[in-house]
């Protein structure tokens, strides 16, 4: 039975290369049962009887590692039973190295209306250093092709504080990103994750990362430059021109529920956060057995309130106290008043009418501030 959920995340775990910083659920595409995977994924999607979605996000891995015919099967299968009149945003992630003319033609024929390109950096030497196979020229070619095909809602991902990266290189990246004339970008500082090439190098003392002060300077520079170029810094890592915020990601930060479909995907349905089987074979067998999930966590009200704060405070607009009280039936001031007043005094938060939100300094310290909202 379709509850009021209006968002879904679909995971395509295949990649044409494995990047040195990535710990997402993914496998090298060669010799993988891709067609069988798509069949099983669509079977899982159909099991939820999804008809009305506001946002649909296809991520990975690399969805564009699929061939053009496979992409067509996926997009057709996901959208044929949807009421497209309510679908506001359908995003697909793409790799500048493998988005050819045939694949763009498939996207154009489908309801996809937003493309997110994993650029990471414009520096060819750095791209090689982080395990990416595309080149700077591929980025420009892809963006030109997408614009020519009529896509105006294009986003790119960039990473800063990369090994050996200088402030001059960050400035160069930001200037090149702005010159693309696109309405959205996400900029993430490099985070070292377990089971990645970079983490192994760091443990061996072979990864020269920028110092924390330089990373903070990079972050400040990025914000100032993008705001000067007409972008709004609407979430810790995200910048958009007016009206081009990622609606799907805003759904996450509003702590709304969503379906997670595919190997290793996470979802949040009826107060339950779940994760699907990750290894492809395990996932295929699980779908055949009628349940793709490997873990389920029933969130208590306390956990739901904590998540509401952690996620909501990532947004520039912060958290609405009235919405919080309406959602949970608890006094916001009774739970968090003292903590908020303390953080306001430290210059990390501000109260703006009905909303509490982070200051610029608070945003940079993101997680440290968020930890204060853990309820004992």
Model-derived segments and spans:
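Minor-groove-contacting beta-hairpin "wing" of winged helix-turn-helix DNA-binding domains
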Residues: 355-359
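Short, amphipathic alpha-helical interaction segments positioned at domain boundaries
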Residues: 361-376
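Short amphipathic alpha-helical interaction segments
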Residues: 329-344
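A short, conserved structural fragment
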Residues: 344-354
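Local cysteine-cluster metal-coordination motifs and their immediate loop/turn environment
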Residues: 13-26
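C-terminal scaffold of the Radical SAM
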Residues: 3-5, 26-48, 52-330
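Conserved N-terminal Rossmann-fold NAD(P)-binding element of oxidoreductases
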Residues: 10
